[in-house]
Design a protein with these regions (language model features):
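Short, ordered loop/turn segments at secondary-structure junctions
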Residues: 11-13, 41-46, 81-82, 114-115, ...
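N-terminal phosphate-binding or glycine-rich loops at protein starts, especially the Walker A/P-loop
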Residues: 1-54
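C-terminal non-catalytic interaction/assembly regions of soluble proteins
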Residues: 255-414
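Glycine-rich oxoanion-binding loops at beta->alpha junctions
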Residues: 51-107, 116, 155-157, 169
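Gly-rich Lys/Arg/Thr-decorated short loops/hinges at beta-loop-alpha junctions or inter-strand turns
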Residues: 2-8, 69-83, 142-152, 179-182, ...
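Accessory alpha-helical/coil subdomains and C-terminal extensions
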Residues: 38, 100, 108-113, 119-131, ...
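Short glycine/serine/threonine-rich phosphate/pyrophosphate-binding segments
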Residues: 15-25, 48-49, 93-95, 115-123, ...
C-alpha cells in the first residue's frame, strides 16, 4: 500500500443521480488501486472545515452496496451552500482545508455539484496553485437546472426531466375527465434557465397536446399576451395546461412572483409563486376554474422514476473523474459531449474549471418559438434521448429500498 488517499464531497441541490456520480467515484477508486482510503466529507466543504468524514472504502464494501447507493435519491454525504471567501481577503479556511488534506494524505479531491460547487472547485484550485500543492482537484457536474457550461447536459437533469414529463402527462389525464372550462398552471424549477420547464413538452404524444403553452426565463413574460394565449386556447379546448418556469421575468427583468424573494449566500433569489401569481391573473381576468401546481422538490428526488441514461452517465462521469486525477489533471471539471443523437452516444472528457464556474447556459433563443410560448423541434430532439430507460429498484413493504443516512443526523458522531 502506498498510503495515499482521496476525498469526495457533494454540495448544492440534490438530484436523483448525484449518488450515481458518488458511486462512480468510489468504483473508479477501487479499480484504480492507487488510493488506500476514500474519505467522504459530510455536508460538502463544511465537512472538511468541521472535520466530519466517512470512510467510504469501508462503508461501500461491495457491488450490492454500490448499486444501492447508485439509485438512492438526494445526497448520501449531505450538502451545504457555503461560499468560500476569496483567499486574498481571508485565507484561514483554505489553510485549514489544505492542512486537513495533508493530515489525511489526500492526493485527489472530487467535488460533486452545480454552479456554486464549481466556484468552490475554482477557488480551491487557485489556492492549490498558489501554495504549489500537488493535490488534484476535480469537479464532477450535477444540476437538475442543466445550466452548467462546457457540457452537453448535466447529470440529474435527465431524471428530473423524465419526472416532469411523466407528471405532466398524468396531470393531463386528470383534466381530461372534466367537461368544464379550466386552466391548470404547473410551476417548474428554473431560476435563470428553462431547460426543466421545456422538458414538459416530452409529455406530448399522439393523443395529448399538453402542455399547451410553455413559458421560460429566456423570453420576457408579457401578462397581456399570456391572457390572450389562454383565451384563444379556451375557444377550442375545455382544459388548458400551462408549464411555467419559477424564474420568468417581465421586460424590466422583474420576477413574476406572488411573494417577495429572498437571497442565499451566493446571491441567488429563492423564488416561489410564479404559478400562484398566474393563477390569480387568470382568475381575475378570465374567470374560469383555475389551479396552480408547484412540483417543488419532487422533481429533484424522484429516484423511482429516474432515467437510466441519466444514471449511467452520472456513474461514468464519476469514474472518469478518477481517471483524470490519475493522469495528473487538476483545476478541471469532467464533461461529456454528445457525439450522435441518432443513435444517441456521448464521449467523456474534461474542461478547465475557470471557463465553467460562475457561468450559466441558457436555452438558445432559436430553440424557442417566435411567440415565446412553446419550444421548437430542435429542443425536443435535444431533450428526448436524456429521459430514455428505466431504473430497476429493490422494494420492501411496497416502497423502494435506499441507503440509510444515519451520519446526517445532528447527533451522529463521525
Amino acid at each position: 500500500m502506498n498510503q495515499s488517499n482521496c476525498m469526495v464531497a457533494q454540495s448544492g441541490g440534490p438530484t436523483a443521480a448525484i449518488n450515481a456520480s458518488l458511486a462512480g467515484v468510489i468504483s473508479g477508486i477501487k479499480k484504480s488501486g492507487k488510493y488506500d482510503t476514500c474519505y467522504g466529507a459530510i455536508n460538502g466543504i463544511l465537512g472538511i472545515l468541521n472535520e466530519r468524514y466517512l470512510n467510504l472504502s469501508q462503508m461501500i464494501p461491495d457491488e450490492k452496496t454500490l448499486n444501492r447507493l447508485k439509485v438512492t435519491p438526494a445526497m448520501y454525504l449531505g450538502s451545504c451552500r457555503h461560499k468560500l471567501p476569496d483567499y486574498k481577503d481571508d485565507d484561514s479556511a483554505y489553510v485549514f482545508i489544505f492542512n486537513q488534506f495533508v493530515k489525511l494524505n489526500i492526493k485527489a479531491f472530487f467535488y460533486i455539484g452545480g454552479n456554486d460547487s464549481m466556484d468552490t472547485v475554482l477557488k480551491l484550485s487557485d489556492y492549490a496553485a498558489k501554495i504549489k500543492s500537488d493535490i488534484r482537484i476535480i469537479g464532477v457536474p450535477k444540476t437538475i437546472d442543466n445550466d452548467l457550461c462546457m457540457i452537453d447536459h448535466t447529470p440529474g437533469f435527465g431524471s428530473a426531466a423524465k419526472y416532469i414529463a411523466s407528471t405532466m402527462l398524468e396531470i393531463a389525464h386528470d383534466t381530461f375527465i372534466y367537461a368544464v372550462k379550466s386552466v391548470t398552471i404547473v410551476e417548474i424549477m428554473g431560476r435563470d434557465a428553462g431547460w426543466l420547464t421545456a422538458a414538459s413538452a416530452l409529455a406530448r404524444n399522439d393523443y395529448n397536446t399538453a402542455p399547451h403553452f410553455i413559458y421560460l426565463p429566456e423570453v420576457a413574460f408579457d401578462k397581456e399576451q399570456f391572457l390572450t394565449d389562454i383565451r384563444n386556447k379556451l375557444k377550442t379546448l375545455n382544459n388548458v395546461i400551462v408549464a411555467v418556469s419559477e424564474g420568468i421575468r417581465d421586460k424590466n427583468g422583474d420576477y413574476i412572483t406572488a411573494s417577495k424573494a429572498v437571497a442565499d449566500q451566493f446571491g441567488h433569489q429563492q423564488l416561489s409563486g410564479a404559478g400562484k401569481a398566474l393563477e390569480f391573473l387568470v382568475k381575475e381576468n378570465i374567470g374560469v376554474k383555475v389551479r396552480s401546481i408547484e412540483i417543488n422538490v419532487l422533481q429533484r428526488c424522484a429516484s423511482h422514476l429516474a432515467s437510466a441514461t441519466d444514471q449511467s452517465e452520472a456513474f461514468a462521469l464519476g469514474e472518469h473523474a478518477v481517471l483524470l486525477a490519475e493522469e495528473g489533471v487538476t483545476a478541471s471539471m469532467v464533461t461529456l459531449t454528445r457525439t450522435s443523437n441518432t443513435p444517441y452516444a456521448v464521449a467523456y472528457d474534461h474542461a478547465p474549471i475557470r471557463g465553467i464556474a460562475n457561468e450559466a447556459k441558457s436555452i438558445p433563443r432559436e430553440w424557442i418559438n417566435a411567440h415565446g410560448n412553446d419550444i421548437r423541434q430542435e429542443l425536443y430532439n435535444y431533450l428526448y434521448p436524456l429521459i430514455q430507460g428505466e431504473v430497476s429498484l429493490t422494494y420492501q413493504n411496497g416502497v423502494p429500498v435506499y441507503m440509510p443516512v444515519p451520519h446526517l443526523k445532528p447527533d451522529h458522531v463521525s
